[in-house]
C-alpha cells in the first residue's frame, strides 16, 4: 500500500501540472472503488485547481467549490499524461485540465477512493487523525507521552493513524530497525531516549524515501511513470532470510496485527541510524 512517501511523491509530481489549471471534464470508467466515486467528480467543469495538498495518505485537490479527496488504496497510482493517451483496463478515473494534460488514476485492485467534501473539517475520512510525522507537532515528548501504559506492540502501534499518520508497514519496520528497537516490544516500554531516537529515525527514513521517489514493490509509480527507488535501499522490509546489511545475520519475519514485520534480532538492541548506508 502506498504510504506517506509515495503519496507525497505523487503530490509533488502532479502539483505543477494542476495548480492554476481549470478542470475541463472528468471521466469515470469504473466508479466501484473502495467507496463509490463521488457523483460530484463529474460536475466540476470550469473549476480551477487552487492547490494540491496532502493529509496523511490522502491527496487533497482544492477547488473553489470544495475538495477532491483521493486515496491510492492498495495498488493505486496517479500519472500525468498527454490528451491522446489511450486508457487501459485498470485506468478508472481521468481529470482533463486546460493545459491539455490528463490526471489519470490507475488501480488494479480498486481499493482506492475519489471522494468529494465541501470542506475538510466535515470530512469523515480526515477526522481523528494524528499529527503529521514530518511536522513540528510530532516530537519525542509527544511520542513518549502517547505511549505511556500502552501494552500494544510498538510496530502496529506506530501504524495507528490516531498516533501518527502515514507510517505504514514498510516505514514502521525500517524506522524501528534504524532506531535499534525490536518491533515486538510493548509501546509503553519506550524510554525517553528511545523516543528521541525513534522520532528522528522516522523523520529521516521518510524524508530519504521521498527523495528517492518512494518505494515501488509492485504497482506504485510516480506521476511520470517511473518507479520509486527507495526499494533498493530497504534494510529489512521484504528481506526475510537475507543477510542483514549491517551484521550479516538473517532478517527475520513475524506477524504483528495480521501484518508482516521484518527485523534483525541481532541489531535491534542498539541504534543503527545515522550509521546507515544512505
From Swiss-Prot:
Catalytic activity as recorded in UniProt: Hydrolysis of DNA containing ring-opened 7-methylguanine residues, releasing 2,6-diamino-4-hydroxy-5-(N-methyl)formamidopyrimidine; 2'-deoxyribonucleotide-(2'-deoxyribose 5'-phosphate)-2'-deoxyribonucleotide-DNA = a 3'-end 2'-deoxyribonucleotide-(2,3-dehydro-2,3-deoxyribose 5'-phosphate)-DNA + a 5'-end 5'-phospho-2'-deoxyribonucleoside-DNA + H(+)
Cofactor note: Binds 1 zinc ion per subunit.
Cofactor: Zn(2+)
Sequence positions that bind DNA: 90, 109, 150
Active site feature: 2 (schiff-base intermediate with dna), 3 (proton donor), 57 (proton donor), 259 (proton donor)
GO biological process, alphabetically ordered: base-excision repair
Keywords: DNA damage, DNA repair, DNA-binding, Glycosidase, Hydrolase, Lyase, Metal-binding, Multifunctional enzyme, Zinc, Zinc-finger
Gene Ontology molecular function, alphabetical: 8-oxo-7,8-dihydroguanine DNA N-glycosylase activity; class I DNA-(apurinic or apyrimidinic site) endonuclease activity; damaged DNA binding; zinc ion binding
ZnF endpoints (FPG-type): 235-269
Source organism, top-level taxon: Bacteria
EC assignment: 3.2.2.23, 4.2.99.18
InterPro entries linked to this entry: DNA_glyclase/AP_lyase_DNA-bd, DNA_glyclase_Znf_dom_DNA_BS, Formamido-pyr_DNA_Glyclase, FPG_cat, MutM-like_N-ter, Ribosomal_uS13-like_H2TH, Znf_DNA_glyclase/AP_lyase, Znf_FPG/IleRS
Role: Involved in base excision repair of DNA damaged by oxidation or by mutagenic agents. Acts as a DNA glycosylase that recognizes and removes damaged bases. Has a preference for oxidized purines, such as 7,8-dihydro-8-oxoguanine (8-oxoG). Has AP (apurinic/apyrimidinic) lyase activity and introduces nicks in the DNA strand. Cleaves the DNA backbone by beta-delta elimination to generate a single-strand break at the site of the removed base with both 3'- and 5'-phosphates.
NCBIfam families for this protein: fpg, PRK01103.1
Subunit (UniProt): Monomer.
Family to which this protein belongs: Belongs to the FPG family.
Protein name per UniProt: Formamidopyrimidine-DNA glycosylase
Species, as recorded: Yersinia pestis (strain Pestoides F)
Amino acid at each position: 500500500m502506498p504510504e506517506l512517501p509515495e503519496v507525497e511523491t505523487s503530490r509533488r509530481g502532479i502539483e505543477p501540472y494542476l495548480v492554476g489549471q481549470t478542470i475541463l471534464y472528468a471521466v469515470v470508467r469504473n466508479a466501484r472503488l473502495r467507496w463509490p466515486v463521488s457523483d460530484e467528480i463529474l460536475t466540476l467543469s470550469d473549476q480551477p485547481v487552487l492547490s494540491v495538498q496532502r493529509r496523511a495518505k490522502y491527496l487533497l485537490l482544492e477547488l473553489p467549490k470544495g475538495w477532491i479527496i483521493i486515496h491510492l488504496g492498495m495498488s493505486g497510482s496517479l500519472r500525468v499524461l498527454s490528451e491522446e493517451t489511450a486508457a487501459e483496463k485498470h485506468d478508472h478515473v481521468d481529470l482533463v485540465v486546460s493545459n491539455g494534460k490528463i490526471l489519470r488514476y490507475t488501480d488494479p485492485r480498486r481499493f482506492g477512493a475519489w471522494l468529494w467534501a465541501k470542506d475538510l473539517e466535515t470530512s469523515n475520512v480526515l477526522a481523528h487523525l494524528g499529527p503529521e510525522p514530518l511536522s513540528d507537532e510530532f516530537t519525542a515528548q509527544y511520542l513518549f507521552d502517547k505511549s505511556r501504559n500502552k501494552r500494544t506492540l510498538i510496530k502496529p502501534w506506530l501504524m495507528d493513524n490516531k498516533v501518527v499518520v502515514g507510517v505504514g508497514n514498510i516505514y514502521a519496520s525500517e524506522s524501528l530497525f534504524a532506531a535499534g528497537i525490536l518491533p515486538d516490544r510493548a509501546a509503553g516500554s519506550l524510554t525517553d531516549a528511545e523516543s528521541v531516537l525513534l522520532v528522528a529515525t522516522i523523520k529521516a527514513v521518510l524524508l530519504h524515501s521521498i527523495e528517492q521517489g518512494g518505494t515501488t514493490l509492485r504497482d506504485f509509480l510516480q506521476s511520470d511513470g517511473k518507479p520509486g527507488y527507495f526499494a533498493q535501499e530497504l534494510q529489512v522490509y521484504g528481506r526475510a532470510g537475507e543477510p542483514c546489511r549491517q551484521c550479516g545475520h538473517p532478517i527475520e519475519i513475524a506477524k504483528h496485527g495480521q501484518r508482516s514485520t521484518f527485523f534483525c534480532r541481532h541489531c535491534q538492541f542498539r541504534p543503527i541510524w545515522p550509521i546507515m548506508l544512505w
